[in-house]
Amino acid sequence: MIDKSAFIHPTAIVEDGAVIGANAHIGPFCIVGPQVEIGEGTVLKSHVVVNGQTKIGRDNEIYQFASIGEVNQDLKYAGEPTRVEIGDRNRIRESVTIHRGTVQGGGLTKVGSDNLLMINAHVAHDCTVGNRCILANNATLAGHVSVDDFAIIGGMTAVHQFCIIGAHVMVGGCSGVAQDVPPYVVAQGNHATPFGVNIEGLKRRGFSREGLVAIRNAYKLLYRSGKTLDEAKLEIAELAEKHPEVKAFTEFFERSTRGPIR
């Protein structure tokens, strides 16, 4: 179903069954598959391909040669009906690729809202990208990666499969991330190692002075105290009882399977 207020360029192909919302814009030479849903006000600039069971929210801007919902690169994939979901107000720049999930990974690749995916960024099968994240040029997420809210991943950075990039993390460019990055941390290098707390980013997002001090103390317990990881976890949990900002660390530890970068 195509809303009567949507614009479809004469050279675009919108297959029967696709749902195109009000005031959406499908530019020249775009291809929209039969199981695709595109929300109100979303713009496909030109030469964009959206395929598979893909749902895109409202007011997104998707630039030329982006490919969304295409068959993933997992060798186990055998054509199962897996999905891609994208939220609202994202900017998805030229040649970005977002692949559909796998049955083994839950069947869903998901991107939240208000994100910026710069040129050539890649979001592999079963990844989850939160809200207000930035993936810079050529940033690459392997399968099953989680990127939490407000995280920034620098250009040319590769993230190993199943890794977690915590909330408010800043990963420097040209890095290789092979373990989980705790929230609030600046990471850099190959393999990526911690370089302190993302203080400037947290200030811009309105964190209080007291909250910043608590986050720094949690970071020091994890990385500067000489304690074992289990010992640091216990003390960080105690700190989290007094400072809600620190709870992000304890929640991260519960999810982490690859262990924090060291």
Swiss-Prot record:
Primary location: cytoplasm
Membrane-spanning intervals of the chain: none
Catalytic activity: a (3R)-hydroxyacyl-[ACP] + UDP-N-acetyl-alpha-D-glucosamine = a UDP-3-O-[(3R)-3-hydroxyacyl]-N-acetyl-alpha-D-glucosamine + holo-[ACP]
Pfam families linked to this entry: Acetyltransf_11, Hexapep
The protein's annotated pathway: Glycolipid biosynthesis; lipid IV(A) biosynthesis; lipid IV(A) from (3R)-3-hydroxytetradecanoyl-[acyl-carrier-protein] and UDP-N-acetyl-alpha-D-glucosamine: step 1/6
Keyword Transferase among record annotations: yes
HAMAP family: LpxA
Family: Belongs to the transferase hexapeptide repeat family. LpxA subfamily.
Name of protein: Acyl-[acyl-carrier-protein]--UDP-N-acetylglucosamine O-acyltransferase
Species in which this protein is naturally found: Salmonella heidelberg (strain SL476)
Gene it is expressed from: lpxA
